[in-house]
Amino acid sequence: MAKPRVYELAKVLNVDSKTVLEKLKDMGEFVKSASSTIEPPVARRLKAEFAKDNAKGDSKPVQQRRPAAPSAPASTSSSAPTPAAPARQASPASAHQQAPTPGAPTPRPQGGARPGMPTPGRHGQNDNRENGRDNREGRENGRQSRPNDRRNNDRRNNQGRPNNSQPVQHQNNRGNASAPRPHAQGPRPGNNPFSRKQGMHTPTPGDIPRPHPMARPTADNGRGGRPGRPGQGQGQGRGFRGGRPGQGGQGGPRPGQWGHNRPGQGGGSQGAGQGGARGGFRGGQGGGNNFQGGGAPSNGPARGGGRGGRGGAAGAFGRQGGKSSKARKNRLAKRHEYEELKAPTIGGVRIPNGNGQTIRLRQGASLADLAEKINVNQAALVTVLFHLGQMATATQSLDEETFQILGEEIGWNIQLVSAEEEDKELLQQFDINLDEEELQDDEDLKPRPPVVTVMGHVDHGKTRLLDTIRKTNVIAREAGGITQRIGAYQVTVNLEGEPRKITFLDTPGHEAFTAMRARGAELTDVAILVVAADDGVMPQTVEAINHAQAAKVPIVVAVNKIDVPGANPEKVRGQLTEFGLVPEEYGGDTMFVDISAKQNLHVDKLLEAVLLTADAELDLRANPDMDARGATVEARLDKGRGAVATVLVQQGTLHVGDAIVAGTSYGRVRAMLDENGQPMEAAGPSTPVQVLGLTSVPTAGDLFLVASDDRAARQIAEKRQATERAAQLAKRRKVVSLEDFKKKFAESEIDMLNIVIKGDSSGSVEALEDSLMKIEVSDEVGIQVIHRGVGAITQNDVNLATVDKAVIIGFNVRPNRQVADLAEREGVEIKYYSVIYRAIEDIEASLKGMLKPEYEEVVTSHSEIREIFRSSKFGNIAGVMVQDGEVKRGTKCRILRNGVATVNDLEISSLRRFKDDVQSVKEGYEAGINLGTFNDIELGDIIETFEMREVERK
């Protein structure tokens, strides 16, 4: 059977499709359009609902139009209609009679049959002699009609029922079939398997039917009562009353007249020889003479025919009582469908609107993470993002900008957690709260040495000053005479006879080491700005001032090289005033000290000024009894000792054997060394120390902390690695939008120089990479760093360079013999550098060499046509006089006529001087020129020759 469509049902019901759709929505069935199909059970429910609505509006006029009919005599009860045939017409008096009071006995009408109930057998009599046969025939009829219970129920529900006190006239099936049928006013007990409620009341503990104490069950199969025995007492029933014709039968009110539609408990009859009332509708518990039949609640699921009073078989669609799980699931599914219908459609998919709710995601999150947070399908988010012009997969890491665009479209406020907040949340999982540790009691705080950073322009004498203070010669060991890494030292000076310790950080002055200088400014307490008295303020000097002021660090200015001819310290003071550093002698608060690091002049005054500034402006105290916290100043990979990190302890005390975490590196402290290489057992606040025992080389600037054990340290490092990897993927993800897809495709044609960088320390590698990425030669070429690392050049580096055709740059590192041989066999170029600016110069030259050559046109000669010779074999031959330059065979030329180029891109195919073929003819000589198949030449034309020459790219 084909499923009906909405518009087809509308035609059958004589209404429009819109009304049908609204009715289905009220019923809980959500249909998309008028052409949608619906299930047959839903169609039956829809027809019943429309029939019920029509009955409410037409019931009163129908009752007024009914013709009056006389009450049937008692003899009509012996008539024999077809078994199980329902009554066709109700009594006309039903419209004018009132229902009796519940519980009050009413006279039993004679000869009446209840509509919708099977009539007695064909040969049924009202005497005791025929009662047994009548009962047997009733049971046979019940068994025959049981398979048609569903049809009978539907047929009964569509027929009107008269009140208890109204006489009912029995009609034969062959009677007036066209008489109108009153519609049922209450809920019909249907058996629709797709309906959540069957129209009947589920009994509760307060209204469950209780059997009469004197009653015993009968086997009426839900249809009729057993024959009564004389001499028994009088039974009085509630609810459904048997509809069998008899004398003096008195029963309770009909179902639906009481509050809860309780099941009937038998229709009563008096006197011997009186036939008991038949069973009520589908379990109405009838039975004369105190006999009760089995029944079912009037508002619950109809149960099958069984032995009365002992419970019946389960219904056709499950056991009675309670709501099935299928019904609950259908209700939830309908609710979900309804919510989806209300959700906005974006790009063809429905996504619930967030209404501006805020949701937090980690750095490098993907669409899968967002889908899990807001409980939507991943594919739907991918579709929405594609609709917005962005192409990404569900597991691809996205940046913050993409998430903001997506959130504005779907109504969510998406916020990405910053790296600092995410790291704090991670540490809190391991009971490490950095914010609480900063709140220390004054009793636990003890004085610590100040951390002083020496900053300034390159070659202004920073390292020389530290050598003078430490009485060493570090500058002699620096390649190129410049500092290329941060050095951390601790010295002891005497201030007013008291020994005081000062921790010094020596930062590079070269412009390539901007990150190192910024990192040094963040770790320091006091900054010494070294300015050469002869050079004055230079670019890196200004940068160092900005770093120190951004970190809110007090500055002490050391005017160096005052012994050099041409030194002008006053000029330096005037220049620095423009940057907010006003000397004390000018009324400011910045201390200036004129020194000579080379001659060791006034260095002690500089140290005194540093200590005075630290004591006056800073509270240099720390808790040495807590777990160590600090920062990584520098890190490198040592061949014999592994990863070596130079750390500065800021809080607590670091001991040998502590489990530490530095960024994504972790390990246990195997040994600690000071700046002179001497072992140490403990390092307190403001102490620089070299730490051995880390599993990998940390990044310069990473904070380090002591964990409870190795397991916690490893878990913290691994989670940081996962977070950093996701953030890098999101940062490096190339967002390909539909608008600039062609532009991205054109950029793929750019020639890229792939580079692998290996260095001796993480700071040097970072500085070299930043410097190389700043090189701009042309839009046609670019640099791509495919790998960087700390340590010697390995076989993996060579293999990676082989695949990507990259150049390996070794900064203060070398490969072993086997790796060098492999690189030579594979044709991989390895360049070694010890000074950073030389590497920058070579890479810039390589990029210029990758540029495509440019050509320019150079005119080589002009020749005037003075004679034209015509040849049947060669065509026209121009006799010319070379006016300037030199004419060569095979060169490009053009014809100039009256100063206008008539034809371009011609070629001199033949060049003769008299009868000889020549390669070239110089200025002042005559020659014969043949231009191939081109013959449009005239006297006085000028033949101009030119050639394309390559121009050097700058």
Curated annotation (Swiss-Prot):
<keyword id="KW-0547">Nucleotide-binding</keyword>
<dbReference type="InterPro" id="IPR036925">
    <property type="entry name" value="TIF_IF2_dom3_sf"/>
</dbReference>
<dbReference type="Pfam" id="PF04760">
    <property type="entry name" value="IF2_N"/>
</dbReference>
<dbReference type="InterPro" id="IPR006847">
    <property type="entry name" value="IF2_N"/>
</dbReference>
<feature type="region of interest" description="G5">
    <location>
        <begin position="596"/>
        <end position="598"/>
    </location>
</feature>
<dbReference type="GO" id="GO:0003743">
    <property type="term" value="F:translation initiation factor activity"/>
</dbReference>
<feature type="compositionally biased region" description="Basic and acidic residues">
    <location>
        <begin position="47"/>
        <end position="59"/>
    </location>
</feature>
<dbReference type="InterPro" id="IPR005225">
    <property type="entry name" value="Small_GTP-bd"/>
</dbReference>
<keyword id="KW-0342">GTP-binding</keyword>
<feature type="region of interest" description="G3">
    <location>
        <begin position="506"/>
        <end position="509"/>
    </location>
</feature>
<dbReference type="Pfam" id="PF00009">
    <property type="entry name" value="GTP_EFTU"/>
</dbReference>
<dbReference type="GO" id="GO:0005525">
    <property type="term" value="F:GTP binding"/>
</dbReference>
<dbReference type="GO" id="GO:0005829">
    <property type="term" value="C:cytosol"/>
</dbReference>
<feature type="binding site">
    <location>
        <begin position="456"/>
        <end position="463"/>
    </location>
    <ligand>
        <name>GTP</name>
    </ligand>
</feature>
<feature type="region of interest" description="G1">
    <location>
        <begin position="456"/>
        <end position="463"/>
    </location>
</feature>
<feature type="region of interest" description="G2">
    <location>
        <begin position="481"/>
        <end position="485"/>
    </location>
</feature>
<feature type="compositionally biased region" description="Gly residues">
    <location>
        <begin position="222"/>
        <end position="254"/>
    </location>
</feature>
<feature type="compositionally biased region" description="Basic residues">
    <location>
        <begin position="325"/>
        <end position="334"/>
    </location>
</feature>
<feature type="binding site">
    <location>
        <begin position="560"/>
        <end position="563"/>
    </location>
    <ligand>
        <name>GTP</name>
    </ligand>
</feature>
<dbReference type="InterPro" id="IPR015760">
    <property type="entry name" value="TIF_IF2"/>
</dbReference>
<keyword id="KW-0648">Protein biosynthesis</keyword>
<feature type="binding site">
    <location>
        <begin position="506"/>
        <end position="510"/>
    </location>
    <ligand>
        <name>GTP</name>
    </ligand>
</feature>
<dbReference type="InterPro" id="IPR000178">
    <property type="entry name" value="TF_IF2_bacterial-like"/>
</dbReference>
<keyword id="KW-0396">Initiation factor</keyword>
<comment type="function">
    <text>One of the essential components for the initiation of protein synthesis. Protects formylmethionyl-tRNA from spontaneous hydrolysis and promotes its binding to the 30S ribosomal subunits. Also involved in the hydrolysis of GTP during the formation of the 70S ribosomal complex.</text>
</comment>
<feature type="region of interest" description="Disordered">
    <location>
        <begin position="47"/>
        <end position="338"/>
    </location>
</feature>
<dbReference type="InterPro" id="IPR009000">
    <property type="entry name" value="Transl_B-barrel_sf"/>
</dbReference>
<dbReference type="InterPro" id="IPR027417">
    <property type="entry name" value="P-loop_NTPase"/>
</dbReference>
<feature type="compositionally biased region" description="Low complexity">
    <location>
        <begin position="64"/>
        <end position="101"/>
    </location>
</feature>
<feature type="domain" description="tr-type G">
    <location>
        <begin position="447"/>
        <end position="619"/>
    </location>
</feature>
<dbReference type="InterPro" id="IPR053905">
    <property type="entry name" value="EF-G-like_DII"/>
</dbReference>
<protein>
    <recommendedName>
        <fullName>Translation initiation factor IF-2</fullName>
    </recommendedName>
</protein>
<feature type="compositionally biased region" description="Gly residues">
    <location>
        <begin position="264"/>
        <end position="321"/>
    </location>
</feature>
<dbReference type="InterPro" id="IPR000795">
    <property type="entry name" value="T_Tr_GTP-bd_dom"/>
</dbReference>
<keyword id="KW-0963">Cytoplasm</keyword>
<feature type="compositionally biased region" description="Polar residues">
    <location>
        <begin position="165"/>
        <end position="176"/>
    </location>
</feature>
<dbReference type="InterPro" id="IPR044145">
    <property type="entry name" value="IF2_II"/>
</dbReference>
<feature type="region of interest" description="G4">
    <location>
        <begin position="560"/>
        <end position="563"/>
    </location>
</feature>
<dbReference type="GO" id="GO:0003924">
    <property type="term" value="F:GTPase activity"/>
</dbReference>
<comment type="similarity">
    <text>Belongs to the TRAFAC class translation factor GTPase superfamily. Classic translation factor GTPase family. IF-2 subfamily.</text>
</comment>
<dbReference type="Pfam" id="PF22042">
    <property type="entry name" value="EF-G_D2"/>
</dbReference>
<feature type="compositionally biased region" description="Basic and acidic residues">
    <location>
        <begin position="124"/>
        <end position="157"/>
    </location>
</feature>
